[in-house]
Swiss-Prot record:
Gene giving rise to this polypeptide: POM121L12
Chain spans, region Disordered: 1-54, 142-162
One Pfam family, short name: POM121
Protein family per UniProt: Belongs to the POM121 family.
Low complexity: compositionally biased ranges: 34-52
Name this polypeptide is given: POM121-like protein 12
Length: 296
């Protein structure tokens, strides 16, 4: 039995490397089955047994980030409170929206200096990063007071007790509204009862007495009597004096001669035309003027 014991210890020494302690008792069962013989084993701590696997902190939770609908692997760890559920992390609030910490207790009472600094700091952060702010203050703006229209009469301005304001508005296009506005307008109220300018004589108003002017177109007179034109049957007589226009000429006369005032009565004499079947029309102008080839 004594020889078998050293042989067994020699076999164990070959199995374990030198300098590696052997686990005895219940610690031998704590060794992992997948550990290789060459891996050194850690010495048990005096507090108790230590697990070979790294312990996971209870205050840390792995967060999976998503980008454009696809999961992106990330190793960032965020701290969550132990009272919260790690499976449902809450949204992280920015510093600008965090409430300042409550003032601490001192021997003389609450320390309000830190709270004041926190409020000032938070106000500055909100001023720099306004974001979406909601104000609890409601501002009410009253509509402007409606001024009374100057086109309404004093009787219409007085509002009856039982009449609403909507019925008081009058249509500006109605006849009554226009007449009421014209009655209040000072312009046009003066009346002129005197004679008109053409009714005032020269002695009173100093204006000239307008008499009927003689007409520029005087009738032809002979021996002081006004001759009336009476058409006569038969052809007209040709005359060289008056301005004549022959309808049988092929070409338009280049020079038109105007008659003299003494030969006016020769226009009314009828003569035999030189062309036989053609007729010659003669007429005269009272005012002497030069005429062009086209009578303009």
């Amino acid at each position: 039995m004594g020889a078998a014991a050293p042989a067994e210890s020699a076999d164990l020494g070959n199995f374990w490397k030198a300098g590696e302690p052997l686990l005895q008792g219940p610690d031998a069962l704590a060794a992992p089955m997948s550990r290789s013989p060459s891996t050194p084993q850690t010495t048990p701590s005096p507090q108790g047994r230590q697990s070979p696997w790294p312990l996971r902190s209870l205050t840390q939770s792995h967060i999976q980030y998503f980008q454009w609908g696809r999961p992106v692997p990330s190793t960032h760890l965020i701290e969550v409170r132990p009272t919260q559920d790690p499976a449902k992390p809450q949204r992280v609030v920015s510093e600008g929206w965090r409430r300042p910490a409550l003032p601490g207790e001192t021997a003389l009472g609450r320390d309000l200096s830190c709270a004041w600094e926190g409020c000032m700091k938070g106000g500055l952060c909100r001023a720099w990063n306004p974001g979406r702010t909601w104000s609890p203050v409601t501002i009410g703006i009253a509509p402007p007071e409606r001024q009374e229209s100057p086109w309404r009469s004093p009787g219409q301005r007085a509002r009856p007790a039982g009449r609403p304001a909507a019925q008081e508005l009058l249509d500006p296009c109605t006849r009554e509204t226009l007449l009421g506005a014209l009655s209040q307008c000072p312009k046009g109220s003066a009346r002129f009862d005197g004679p008109l300018w053409f009714e005032v004589s020269d002695s009173k108003g100093g204006r000239r007495n307008l008499q009927p002017r003689p007409s520029a177109f005087k009738p032809l007179s002979k021996n002081g009597a006004v001759a009336s034109f009476v058409p006569r049957p038969g052809p007209l007589k040709p005359s060289l004096g008056p301005w004549s226009l022959s309808f049988c000429d092929d070409a338009w006369p280049s020079v038109l001669v105007q008659p003299a005032p003494s030969a006016i009565w020769d226009f009314w004499e009828a003569t035999t035309p030189s062309c036989g079947s053609c007729s010659r029309v003669s007429f005269a102008l009272e005012v002497t003027q030069s005429a062009g080839p086209f009578g303009s």
